[in-house]
Amino acid sequence: MNNLKLARFFATISKESKYVPNSGSYPLGYKVGAIHCGVKKNSTLDLAVLVSETPASAAAVFTTNKFKAAPVQVSRQILNDKNGKGISSIVVNSGNANAVTGKGGIEDALKMVDTVDSTLKNAPSSTLVMSTGVIGQRLPIDNILKGIPVALKDVGSSHEDWLRCAQGIMTTDTFPKLVSKSFEIDGRKYSLAGLAKGAGMICPNMATLLGFFVTDAPVTPGALSKILTYATDRSFNCISVDGDMSTNDTICAMANGAAGGEEISETSSQFSKIQDEITLFAQQLAQLVVRDGEGATKFITINVQDAQSYADAKKVASSIANSALFKTAMYGKDANWGRILCAVGYADADVNVLKTNVSFIPADGSAELKLLVNGEPEKVDEERASEILELEDLEIRISLGTGGGQEANFWTCDLSHEYVTINGDYRS
Amino acid sequence: MNNLKLARFFATISKESKYVPNSGSYPLGYKVGAIHCGVKKNSTLDLAVLVSETPASAAAVFTTNKFKAAPVQVSRQILNDKNGKGISSIVVNSGNANAVTGKGGIEDALKMVDTVDSTLKNAPSSTLVMSTGVIGQRLPIDNILKGIPVALKDVGSSHEDWLRCAQGIMTTDTFPKLVSKSFEIDGRKYSLAGLAKGAGMICPNMATLLGFFVTDAPVTPGALSKILTYATDRSFNCISVDGDMSTNDTICAMANGAAGGEEISETSSQFSKIQDEITLFAQQLAQLVVRDGEGATKFITINVQDAQSYADAKKVASSIANSALFKTAMYGKDANWGRILCAVGYADADVNVLKTNVSFIPADGSAELKLLVNGEPEKVDEERASEILELEDLEIRISLGTGGGQEANFWTCDLSHEYVTINGDYRS
């Protein structure tokens, strides 16, 4: 147990240095920050705020879990009521999910919104609210309401402010997940920032998946909503740590237009360009969540090709990514094509069993290792397989041989002893 | 590692003594046995046969995995061709699944059928064939074909013969799964014997789920097929060790009528009586498979009540039973209603979130422990919860509060360090 804790500590340090940026290129017109207000018992950051200098377009994708947390219900209502227009800020507390908390929980979430709006002199209902942490307990709402004006005074737009904001939404995450980039459309520079949290679910800290994208591009609410759905489908909905979906999962986007330029609608010529940029960006952010999967020692890309449809390709990829047997084999560094094939076979998708191919694509750029060709097993060079499986990153490519030509990517991690330790033994 | 192996060894001994019967009440007109013929490298039993003295009705439910093993394809064809009539025997090899073996594999399976039929002077295609074990390798078919006449000479109808037959189909199972019982219909005594194997999938020994029921009641093929589907839906399709479905899964039934009496068809008055008997029996056998789940330390019954439909109740139960987070919480003896609720919430079924109840039903008959009442968390007595979770057996009762009144049961085990060790570390 002590060895495991030590190993996890060192893994954390190494992940921090690998995946947390030292600088960034952030969108104009946003200020962010985070403080400790007293939700978490230790003194770590637990209240994060993000403020746009001007009211922005906003969109969100919420959990489909039937037990929707209070902040999910409240934020969804606000976005509906305002048709995704005039959203100025986001407030997030970590340490308590405000889920399964009844009417009182809804009132608490509304109070958080009202306090942000009145402090900033926003129009009413201009703020989205999110929570992550323990479920079934009421928020320490007084601490939060007292903290909000303090947090809002302490916002800024430096790299350190963004990093602090990303830290403020963490629960069991071992490192803050923050990405940023700039890109050009028609000669104009736009920037994107993304923050996320999530590392499987640990109760009492049920670690929700939260993700935020904010840009200074001018995008209509309708276009932003379409882009977010498309990007989420191909990023946060294509990752699996343990297959469970929490009561609080929320991915949201804001576009304030601070960088100027013509407003981008669904029919604009720039629409597909910005959709592609945001999708790639969302994938980058989602992959960080997988890298921080509880007890993860491997980062696995599952690439499914030649399916009849994108949906079929995704079903097969998801079936593999969620197979406990496959995930333990990866942890054991075992070139077990049987388990991969098995998971392909029970997915609800068209497969040509006589034309199915399975290969390992090594992360170091060396030649692929074929495991199954046209439904027949290859004689596998076990030494070569071991070499490939020693690397942290691995891509598994499956061709379903249907002639449909459709493709999907999915990202997952392995299932380790440490996962069981974190999720089963945390009381000891 | 050595401690784990030792623990598993002692767990095996204790399971053997608890779940393997010392005697039985077997159906008339069957002879069974098993030998070592040389499929497995060690000298354990690897070829089992079951022979009915007269041609019998037969039915089977096969894996829905798209990569169907050769014996699955061959047995299905035989049952189709003969409309489930005139089946005299079953032959099973363990140690090699004859899966993903192409045309040669089909030929091997057909040879096994032909050799049994010619040795017994059966009509052609009177034998069903099954295989379990490594996938992707051709059978050592000569050893098997030489072994078949030897095995068929050495059959009997004693308890020891039935036990030997159950041992002959084992791969990674830690104990043979054999049950038998007698029951009366209209004053006539009938008997049932059941054998099963399965303990999660371990590659290279991908441990298929196989199950057999044989009875001396006279049942038409149509009625038997209906009964088997009904019973399997409520037994083998209601268990989960790790959620994966193999290329070889097969549940089959035979009814030879050796006990006499009027033939039972779908319209007979005795139909529902024998269907209920076989269903209860199938549940008993399926539960043994869960008890032998890889690394299992807990046996968990999930009882979902007040669903809109049986299908909905089963979906919710299955969602909980397959949640890695729930299963690790059970291993950690943690009364984590949040994870249960979460799995309820993402199942594709009607749920009244304001009327959902969750309770622990202790195995020792003491009072239930309410965790969630009408969607609101109870103050849980942690000491009482710990007491309940110390027991090997536990029932979790969930009421969905829909007013539909439908109910389903599901059986599962926990997810332990040992599961990861068995499935990830077996090469070390």
Curated annotation (Swiss-Prot), chains A, B:
The cross-references to SUPFAM superfamilies, in alphabetical order and at most eight, read: DmpA/ArgJ-like
**Which pathway does the protein contribute to?**
Amino-acid biosynthesis; L-arginine biosynthesis; L-ornithine and N-acetyl-L-glutamate from L-glutamate and N(2)-acetyl-L-ornithine (cyclic): step 1/1; Amino-acid biosynthesis; L-arginine biosynthesis; N(2)-acetyl-L-ornithine from L-glutamate: step 1/4
Site (Involved in the stabilization of negative charge on the oxyanion by the formation of the oxyanion hole) found at 132-133
Task: Tell me the keywords, alphabetical order.
Answer: Acyltransferase, Amino-acid biosynthesis, Arginine biosynthesis, Autocatalytic cleavage, Mitochondrion, Multifunctional enzyme, Transferase
Q: Which BP terms does GO give this entry?
A: L-arginine biosynthetic process; ornithine biosynthetic process
Provide the top EC class: transferase
- Tell me which domain of life the UniProt entry assigns to the organism this sequence originates from: Eukaryota
The UniProt catalytic activity note for this protein reads: N(2)-acetyl-L-ornithine + L-glutamate = N-acetyl-L-glutamate + L-ornithine; L-glutamate + acetyl-CoA = N-acetyl-L-glutamate + CoA + H(+)
Coiled-coil parts of chain: none
Record note on modification: The alpha and beta chains are autoproteolytically processed from a single precursor protein within the mitochondrion.
- List the Gene Ontology MF annotations in alphabetical order: glutamate N-acetyltransferase activity; L-glutamate N-acetyltransferase activity
Question: Site: Cleavage. Where?
Answer: 207-208
- Its primary localisation, in coarse terms, equals mitochondrion
**Entries under InterPro entries matching the protein:** Arg_biosynth_ArgJ (IPR002813), ArgJ-like_dom_sf (IPR016117), ArgJ_beta_C (IPR042195)
Which Gene3D superfamilies does this UniProt record tie to the protein? arginine biosynthesis bifunctional protein suprefamily, ArgJ beta chain, C-terminal domain, L-amino peptidase D-ALA esterase/amidase
Q: What is its EC number?
A: 2.3.1.35, 2.3.1.1
Identify the residues that bind substrate: 171, 197, 208, 294, 423, 428
Report the subcellular localization.
Answer: Mitochondrion matrix
- One GO CC annotation: mitochondrial matrix
Record note on quaternary structure:
Heterodimer of an alpha and a beta chain.
Misc. remarks from the entry: This protein may be expected to contain an N-terminal transit peptide but none has been predicted.
Function noted in UniProt: Catalyzes two activities which are involved in the cyclic version of arginine biosynthesis: the synthesis of acetylglutamate from glutamate and acetyl-CoA, and of ornithine by transacetylation between acetylornithine and glutamate.
| Similarity comment text for this entry | Belongs to the ArgJ family.
Q: Which PANTHER family match?
A: ARGININE BIOSYNTHESIS BIFUNCTIONAL PROTEIN ARGJ, ARGININE BIOSYNTHESIS BIFUNCTIONAL PROTEIN ARGJ, MITOCHONDRIAL
Q: What is this protein called?
A: Arginine biosynthesis bifunctional protein ArgJ, mitochondrial
What is the species listed in this Swiss-Prot or TrEMBL entry?
A: Komagataella phaffii (strain GS115 / ATCC 20864)
Q: Give the taxonomic lineage as stored in the record.
A: Eukaryota, Fungi, Dikarya, Ascomycota, Saccharomycotina
